[in-house]
Amino acid sequence: CGHAVLNYIIRDHDNYAFQNRKNHLVSIAEQLNAKWGAGTVELCITDQYYNMKEIIEQNIHLIENAKKACEKVGLIPNVSPIRGGTDGCHLSFRGLPCPDIGTGAHAYHGPYEHISAQSMDKVVDMVIELVKIYSTFSK
């Protein structure tokens, strides 16, 4: 008897759609087990990442100040949502909001992923500006 193991990562910007995607897999497993016999498909869903939008929205100053820091060093901020998958996601849900502020790299997670030394230098400048912004906040 053949055996196959499939691993999927399910992510979505919308929590409702995220749950629907998981429910869809459950439904498929139920249909296949009904057709081919119980145990034909074993499904184990383990949540690893959640959309950190809800955490970041409560701490929007993080995004606003990152945008200011970008502008101070001549970068044009490009704010776009990500679906999770970063250490910052885990930290955000543990009480330390950590939006992904980028690295200056291009073509992420593919064979052409790259970053120039100039881009790395510019990101360092941006982080220094961000630290300066937060250093003016009083506790």
Pin down the residues of each PLM region.
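Metal-dependent amide/peptide-bond hydrolase catalytic core
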Residues: 1-139
